Amino acid sequence: MHTPLIDLRGIRKSYGGGDSPRVNVLRGIDLSIHAGEFVAIVGASGSGKSTLMNILGCLDRPTSGEYLFAGENVAELGGDELAWLRREAFGFVFQGYHLIPSGSAQENVEMPAIYAGTPAAERHARAAALLDRLGLASRTGNRPHQLSGGQQQRVSIARALMNGGHIILADEPTGALDSHSGAEVMTLLDELASQGHVVILITHDREVAARANRVIEISDGLVISDTARDLSTPRSANPAALQAVDLRKRLSEGSGSHGAWKGELLDAIQAAWRVMWVNRFRTALTLLGIVIGVASVVVMLAVGEGSKRQVMAQMSSFGSNIIYLNGKAPNPRAPKGVITLEEVAALGELPEVKMIMPVNGGQAGVRFGNVDHSSYVGGNDTHFPAIFNWPVAEGSYFSEADEQGAAAVAVIGYKVRQKLFGDRIDPIGQYILIENVPFQVVGVLQEKGATSGDLDSDNRIAIPYSSASIRLFGSQDPEYITIATRDANNVKQAEAAIRTLLQRLHNGKQDYELTNNAAMIQAEARTQNTLSLMLGSIAAISLLVGGIGVMNIMLMTVRERTREIGIRMATGARQRDILRQFLTEAVMLSVVGGLAGIVLALAMGAALLASKVAVAFTLSAVIGAFACALVTGVIFGFMPARKAARLDPVAALTSE
């Protein structure tokens, strides 16, 4: 006697309990089915026949009793092994067809083979052959809504046969069809049974049940009759059908086989893209949050980096070997210290000092014709262009003779030139009024640009130190001293030498302070970095909001596609397959949104550059923003994906 392929012993199934009343749906089912049988299970609505089919197809577990499949106790099988059985042993044909709306007929048929890890070319060919065999060769690209009821049911039969369909579980396969389409479906099931497939037909129609060679009637969860009839033509088991002996080996091998992970991932990506395209309006709205978030982060960081580079370049252009010396009050009650010209001369003798220049200046009103302007006026000596690496663009700098004679000459900055003279008037030789004192313009400095905040280096006027002291400010003592060291790498040593000399000259009083350009550049860099971080953090909030939007949409998608999840599980999807599918969709949303956000950011950057705004895109910022979008997709997509993977197959299939 051969071991039954399916052997049920005392199977019971009940629902409820606890605070709700317990409902006994199956109350002790004993049933054996051998390879090659065509069995019809008949019963009225509510008799338990659909619950029995779910248990037979490993979609549900009994409350008690023993279910042996090819001698293996199904209760001892894990989730992956049950999925393998649904994928390799069973093929489901449902009354409601249960096709995935977003997929074509070909894609619906291929689904079990995807979860089996079948190579793409092989499954494409097999699906096409099955559809051709069932008369749907011209409908392979049609979606379910483009097919009639009979055609949809034939697609579901082809899907059931995709991985062999050794056991066909047909739940009311003709219930939603007209008589002609129903007859066609039953003819197909007859053919499958004659070819050796086990066909288990669930129906309430006794005429349909009469097509089977064995009719089992259940009522109120019990088998009340089991009738077999002789066949005029004996059915022989298909050599390819599952046999109890080889199933044990195939089950242990197959449940551990996951297929090629690259192929599975590619299939998940293709399915995700298909879903996104079908629901493209919703997809676009969901992407908007990610796009705006990524674009905001990239543009904000680019603006911050551009501003930083601009400021750093301008500050560095003045030289990193510059030291500034000015007097200060040693304590709140003491007067501010004064650096005299005699001390300037003494400092100039130090071997570490290359050049030294006293500066006497301040903000002053400037006029040319009827144009008034406010500018910084600095009394310098002839070392100014060399110390600051700031050549003259037009005319010439004032001479040593001008300094000695306190000449009323001026070299103006680029911004002063534009404000007073514009582009039409040549400023060289023109007279301007500085605090109502006439000065002749002898030169125009090259454009430097703003360094930080409101400080604009081009909004200045250089005049001889002697002229500033005598004609404008009335003081011989400098406002501060500018010192250029011989070696930019030894600024600290130069500072130490200057301090030592000043300590001696000032009798130990700390009524002065030293700052150097390098330290100022570093401080400004830290400020700019902090500003960039703040801008990026503000922009990142929009990316976070976009991620929450992805999670909300995915949670709604899981609810809307609950039946699809049940279909995938019925065709052999494991929990991790469902998890991967929905997580891939979330990540795909983030990837597409991230790429679109980068493109938008580059376009916005180009517009800002055209508007003369300093922008500097960095690869790290672009990659970082894209990576954040990707991580956002994983984090906010995981919870919906996990929820989808944990759905009960039966509950998912019966959801509306």
Swiss-Prot record:
Q: Which residues bind ATP?
A: G43, A44, S45, G46, S47, G48, K49, S50
Q: Which GO terms describe its molecular function?
A: ABC-type xenobiotic transporter activity; ATP binding; ATP hydrolysis activity
Any one annotated GO CC term: plasma membrane
Q: Which residues cross the membrane?
A: 284-304, 538-558, 589-609, 619-639
Which BP terms from GO are recorded?
xenobiotic transport
Q: What is its main location?
A: membrane
- Could you tell me the keywords of this UniProt record? ATP-binding, Cell inner membrane, Cell membrane, Membrane, Nucleotide-binding, Translocase, Transmembrane, Transmembrane helix, Transport
* Documented EC number(s): 7.6.2.-
Protein's cellular compartments:
Cell inner membrane
* Membrane topology designation: Multi-pass membrane protein
Q: Does the keyword Ligase apply?
A: no
Which superkingdom heads the taxonomic lineage of this protein's source? Bacteria
> Which parts of the sequence belong to the ABC transporter domain?
6-245
Q: Tell me, how does this one assemble?
A: Part of the tripartite efflux system PvdRT-OpmQ, which is composed of an inner membrane component with both ATPase and permease domains, PvdT, a periplasmic membrane fusion protein, PvdR, and an outer membrane component, OpmQ.
Q: Which family does it belong to?
A: Belongs to the ABC transporter superfamily. Macrolide exporter (TC 3.A.1.122) family.
Q: What does this protein do?
A: Part of the tripartite efflux system PvdRT-OpmQ required for the secretion into the extracellular milieu of the siderophore pyoverdine (PVD), which is involved in iron acquisition. This subunit binds PVD and drives its secretion by hydrolyzing ATP. The system is responsible for export of newly synthesized PVD after the final steps of biosynthesis have taken place in the periplasm.
PANTHER family recorded: MACROLIDE EXPORT ATP-BINDING_PERMEASE PROTEIN MACB, MEMBRANE COMPONENT OF TRANSPORTER-RELATED
- What protein name does the entry list? Pyoverdine export ATP-binding/permease protein PvdT
